[in-house]
Each structure stands twice: as C-alpha cells, then as structure tokens.
C-alpha cells in the first residue's frame, strides 16, 4: 500500500473555504517528474500546449522560467493579466515531489477582486509512472460566479492544461 503526497495549503486558501475550488490529476507511464517539471516551470512554452493562457510577463524582470519568489503576470479564463507570485518552489528529486504554487490577484472593486492560490505537485511513482496534481482555490465575486458555470470552465481548463503539459513532456 502507498500513500500519496498532497498539496500544502496556506490557511487562507484551504479547499472548501473559498468561493471556487477545483482539483485535477493525471497519472501516466513512460514520463518522469523531471520531464514534466521542465515544461511546467518554463512559461515560454505554456501557450504552445495550453490555449487558455496569454500575456505572460515578468514585470520585475527574470523569467521565463519560474523560480522561488519570482513575480509574473498572465491572463486566463477571460481575466486581464493577474499579478502572480511564486510562493512555493521545490524541484522534484528522488523520493521528493516537485511543488509549485503561486498566488494570483486581480485588484479593483469588490465585483472585480480575485485572490487565487494555484498549486502543483509532480512526483515519480513506482513502475516508471508520474503523477501530476493541480488544485486551485479562488476567493472573490468573480470566483463565485465562475463556480456556478456548467460545464465548469476551471475544471475543464485545468484538465486541458494537464493534458497539454503531459503531451509536451512526451515530445
């Protein structure tokens, strides 16, 4: 029997306490956590395998590869570019999952404000398999509105991101 690793959640973003939460996961054979990680942290590749992201920028310099503490911005789900900040960054290693989390914010009126934590976990599994888990908690009125849409655009969008990421890692 095995126990799987989980996302590390700051109190503010605990699943079920915000206005919108989704979780997506894939487990595939024939790839490693290192294969996936390279594609995930390189934002210059995102638009080649995920069509729900645009306008990626690094207003304080750095990039396009994400690193611990870096600030960046990107547009997604019809929102203008969100101010994002990497708050967790752990490269996958033997017996250690890769962990990447960023906060993203949209400022403005209460009707416009959005506060997000998007977390990723990338880990090697026995038998030459890799597991990729992505979860996101959103807080704010735009998040509450997004949560009521069917089909769920965030759930489907993140699944498309996972599928594209796995396809890019397999190239």
Language-model features, listed with the residues they occupy:
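Short, well-structured hydrophobic secondary-structure segments
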Residues: 68-79
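Short Pro/Gly-enriched beta-strand edge/turn motifs at strand-loop
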Residues: 6-10, 65-70, 99-106
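A conserved amphipathic terminal alpha-helix motif
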Residues: 5-6, 131-133, 137-171
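Hydrophobic pocket/interface hotspot
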Residues: 35-40, 46, 70-72, 86, ...
